[in-house]
Amino acid sequence: MNSIEFPLLDRTTQNSVISTTSNDLSNWSRLSSLWPLLYGTSCCFIEFASLIGSRFDFDRYGLVPRSSPRQADLILTAGTVTMKMAPSLVRLYEQMPEPKYVIAMGACTITGGMFSTDSYSTVRGVDKLIPVDVYLPGCPPKPEAVIDAITKLRKKVSREIYEDRIGSQQENRYFTTNHKFHVGRSTHTGNYDQGLLYKSPSTSEIPPETETFFKYKSSVSSHELVN
C-alpha cells in the first residue's frame, strides 16, 4: 500500500492496529474496482481495444468493462460526439451511480478535432455535456497514454473527498438537455437534401443570401427548413 497516497494508513500502534479515515478507506477500495463503460464512436476506440490484449493487460488495474451504465463508475468517451448523440451520452452519464468519472480520449472528443471548423453537427468538446476528470489528447492516443490517464485518475481518486465532489457538481451544473439550434443561414453552399427544402409560394426565386434557413426541433431526429 502506498503510504504517500494514504499517509494516515501508515500510523500503527504496538498492537498493529491501523488508524485511518473513512474517506481514505473508501478511496482505497475504489482504486482497484474502476469499471468502465466504453463509449467509442470512431478510430480512437481501436487504440483502447488493444489494451484488452496480453501486451498491456488492463485487468491489472481492476478495469472490468460493463455494458450497463448502472454497473459502471467510469465512462470513457473516444471519438466524435454529434448533436444527435449528445442526449444519449448525457442519459448514460446520469444513469451511472455516484461517484462517477469521465475520461475524454482523443482530439475529436476534447475539441471536436478536424470536424470543429466546418461541421454544424459536431459537439466542440464533450465537457460541454458532462464533467470531464481526465483529458487524453492525441489523434489517436497510444495505449500507453491511456494507461497513463488511468494512473492519473487513480491518483485523483486516492486524494478525493466524496462530499467535496458532490458539492462541486451541485454548484457547477452542466448542460443536460437536448441541443437546440437557432434559426440561421445555410452553411457553405446550401446544398441540402431536396426533400427538406421549403420554397415560398409567393415567389419563384429567393435571394441567395436568404435562400434557406434551418431550424432544429426539440426532437433530435428531424429537421425543418423555413424562410
Swiss-Prot record:
<protein>
    <recommendedName>
        <fullName>NAD(P)H-quinone oxidoreductase subunit K, chloroplastic</fullName>
        <ecNumber>7.1.1.-</ecNumber>
    </recommendedName>
</protein>
<dbReference type="GO" id="GO:0008137">
    <property type="term" value="F:NADH dehydrogenase (ubiquinone) activity"/>
</dbReference>
<keyword id="KW-0618">Plastoquinone</keyword>
<feature type="binding site">
    <location>
        <position position="43"/>
    </location>
    <ligand>
        <name>[4Fe-4S] cluster</name>
    </ligand>
</feature>
<keyword id="KW-0934">Plastid</keyword>
<keyword id="KW-0521">NADP</keyword>
<keyword id="KW-0479">Metal-binding</keyword>
<feature type="binding site">
    <location>
        <position position="108"/>
    </location>
    <ligand>
        <name>[4Fe-4S] cluster</name>
    </ligand>
</feature>
<dbReference type="InterPro" id="IPR006138">
    <property type="entry name" value="NADH_UQ_OxRdtase_20Kd_su"/>
</dbReference>
<dbReference type="GO" id="GO:0009060">
    <property type="term" value="P:aerobic respiration"/>
</dbReference>
<dbReference type="GO" id="GO:0009535">
    <property type="term" value="C:chloroplast thylakoid membrane"/>
</dbReference>
<keyword id="KW-1278">Translocase</keyword>
<keyword id="KW-0813">Transport</keyword>
<dbReference type="Pfam" id="PF01058">
    <property type="entry name" value="Oxidored_q6"/>
</dbReference>
<keyword id="KW-0874">Quinone</keyword>
<dbReference type="GO" id="GO:0015990">
    <property type="term" value="P:electron transport coupled proton transport"/>
</dbReference>
<dbReference type="GO" id="GO:0048038">
    <property type="term" value="F:quinone binding"/>
</dbReference>
<feature type="binding site">
    <location>
        <position position="44"/>
    </location>
    <ligand>
        <name>[4Fe-4S] cluster</name>
    </ligand>
</feature>
<keyword id="KW-0150">Chloroplast</keyword>
<dbReference type="GO" id="GO:0045271">
    <property type="term" value="C:respiratory chain complex I"/>
</dbReference>
<dbReference type="GO" id="GO:0051539">
    <property type="term" value="F:4 iron, 4 sulfur cluster binding"/>
</dbReference>
<feature type="binding site">
    <location>
        <position position="139"/>
    </location>
    <ligand>
        <name>[4Fe-4S] cluster</name>
    </ligand>
</feature>
<keyword id="KW-0004">4Fe-4S</keyword>
<keyword id="KW-0472">Membrane</keyword>
<comment type="similarity">
    <text>Belongs to the complex I 20 kDa subunit family.</text>
</comment>
<comment type="function">
    <text>NDH shuttles electrons from NAD(P)H:plastoquinone, via FMN and iron-sulfur (Fe-S) centers, to quinones in the photosynthetic chain and possibly in a chloroplast respiratory chain. The immediate electron acceptor for the enzyme in this species is believed to be plastoquinone. Couples the redox reaction to proton translocation, and thus conserves the redox energy in a proton gradient.</text>
</comment>
<dbReference type="GO" id="GO:0019684">
    <property type="term" value="P:photosynthesis, light reaction"/>
</dbReference>
<dbReference type="InterPro" id="IPR006137">
    <property type="entry name" value="NADH_UbQ_OxRdtase-like_20kDa"/>
</dbReference>
<comment type="subunit">
    <text>NDH is composed of at least 16 different subunits, 5 of which are encoded in the nucleus.</text>
</comment>
<keyword id="KW-0408">Iron</keyword>
<dbReference type="GO" id="GO:0005506">
    <property type="term" value="F:iron ion binding"/>
</dbReference>
<keyword id="KW-0520">NAD</keyword>
<keyword id="KW-0793">Thylakoid</keyword>
<keyword id="KW-0411">Iron-sulfur</keyword>
